[in-house]
Amino acid sequence: MIRPSTQRIIVSAAAAFVVASIGVYAQAPPAQTGFKRTPVQQADLSVPGKEVVQAIAEIQPGAQSGRHTHPGEEVAYVLEGTITLEIDGKPAATKKAGEAFIIPPGTIHNAKSAGGAVARVLGTYIIDKGKPVATPVQ
């Protein structure tokens, strides 16, 4: 049998978790239609507290990723199609299949499919272990 004081702590902790979860969900912007990021692999690195995440971003014609940031370096390679890469403070750049780019941590950016075909980009992210790969920005 659980003691009443322990039971109160458990109920309070559960309630706090639910309230915090609702707050996070309410603040998240809606998902971008026509954009999908599929994880390929995730592994710890030799540097303590760091991990690498690889994912394929698929951007349908006319769609975009939406403005977002990453907590670490993004090293990306365009597998298929063409994208327009918009990085805050820089002119937009066109990246075609076979081209690569690097985005520094915390940099606000957006990728748009260009050229009327699906664009697929392989992203490699070096991040602190347990952090989300991407954070949407309004």
Residue ranges and their predicted role:
Residues 59-60, 89-106:
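Short acidic-glycine-tyrosine-enriched beta hairpin
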Residues 11-21:
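Bacterial N-terminal signal peptides
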Residues 2-13:
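Bacterial N-terminal signal peptides that target proteins for export
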Residues 73, 92, 106-132:
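Ligand-binding loop in jelly-roll beta-barrel domains
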Residues 70-90, 99, 129:
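Glycine- and acidic-residue-biased ligand/ion/polar-headgroup-sensing regions
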Residues 32-67, 124:
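A short glycine-rich, His/Asp/Glu-containing loop-to-beta-strand
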